[in-house]
Amino acid sequence: MKNSTNQGFDQHYNAQVAVDQDSLLIVGQSLSNHPNDQAEAQPTLEAIPPALGTPSSAALDNGYFSAANIEHFKALRIDPYIATGRDPHHPSWHERFAQSLTPPPEQASPKVKMAYKLQTEIGKAIYRLRKCTVEPVIGIIKETLAFRQFSLRGLSHVAGEWALVCLSFNLKRLHTLTNGQLPPLRISPTGC
């Protein structure tokens, strides 16, 4: 990516995480050099190990919104809740106390249908959880673990570095969840 300040080029990467809502553990991670998040939902979802199962729903911010992503989630039987734009911080009292919206017609665009879905009570509740699931994890990685930039270069090396960052977050989180009382590691005398 062209850097306008020094006329050189910078390497930028797009790191993603899938976070379990109950434990706040990172269950899947991916990294790419794509400039936006629209193409990142599918690789991040595929990074979740099959042994953990498939989530029943997913809440994503508006950077992930596309008709293709909605169809991909539906094909996997995952109920998507993807923002369609920015919500105002302070809606007017008319909007706050407005009567319930009427469902959009069947031929409405995916964006109109998703906007309606997010205005339902269940849509609001599920999307609200995103703010206290994924965002704290990213904040802890940036602030507590002090990880703000990659030390390595090249996509494969940086992907490995991101995997280590996610692993270190999960170890820290497991320590918190178990109050530092992890079961002892048992090593058999034969080494197997």
Which stretches of residues belong to each language-model region?
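Anion-binding and metal-coordination hotspots
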Residues: 1-192
